Curated annotation (Swiss-Prot):
The keyword Phosphoprotein does not apply. Pfam families: Caudo_TAP. This is Tail fiber assembly protein U'. InterPro entries: Phage_T4_Gp38_tail_assem. The gene is U'. Chaperone involved in tail fiber assembly. Expressed alternatively with tail fiber assembly protein U'. Remains associated to the tail fiber and participates in the host receptor binding. Two alternate tail fiber assembly proteins U and U' are encoded extending the host range of the virus. It comes from the Viruses. GO terms for cellular component: host cell cytoplasm; virion component. Belongs to the tfa family.
Length: 177
């Protein structure tokens, strides 16, 4: 099975490559050990999965046809077309680690960023939910029921805002009904 690591753009290495670059604006891609991406494609088997992954091991492309992959800035590995490998996708939740496809493990910094994103999403949800009630309150035309809902959502917003996303794990308060 093929495994081409750290593929980057480089200059043409032969006169023929130079002419092709000049004529068709071809970008030449090479592995960290100097192999030409285009020449190596013929060495991949037709009945396997080809996965491109970034420098963190996160899977960014999955194809059966290796020529459909743009591997610039990534590595490409060939894997058997079996259920364990087919379950992966390019959502960012899968990685190639130690020779196998696994669920992604997030760094603490990534987990903190995810928590901060969730916090901002929840605060936007509060703004969306309460916008009409807030206008009704300002105009003095809010019903008692909606005033109660507005209060519950604003208390929820206060709890969300005070949630510390710098220490893991982060637990957010329950949303009002």
């Amino acid at each position: 099975m093929m495994h081409l690591r750290n593929i980057t753009a480089g200059n043409p290495k032969t006169k023929e490559q130079y002419q092709l670059t000049k004529q068709f604006n071809i970008k030449w891609l090479y592995t960290e050990d100097g192999k030409n991406w285009y020449e190596e494609q013929k060495n991949f088997q037709y009945d396997t999965l080809k996965m491109a992954y970034d420098h963190n091991g996160v899977i960014i492309c999955i194809e059966k046809d290796v020529s459909a992959i743009n591997p610039e800035g990534a590595s490409v590995v060939e894997l058997p077309d079996i259920t364990a490998n087919r379950r992966a996708d390019i959502s960012g939740k899968w990685m190639f680690k130690d020779g196998v496809v696994v669920k992604r493990t997030y760094t603490e910094e990534e987990q903190r960023q995810q928590a901060e994103n969730e916090k901002q999403s929840l605060l936007q949800l509060v703004r969306d939910k309460t916008q009409l009630w807030d206008s009704q309150l300002r105009l003095g035309i809010i019903s008692a029921e909606n005033k109660q809902k507005l209060t519950e959502w604003m208390l929820f917003a206060q709890k969300v805002e005070s949630t510390d996303t710098s220490s893991l794990p982060v637990t957010f308060p329950e949303q009002p009904e």
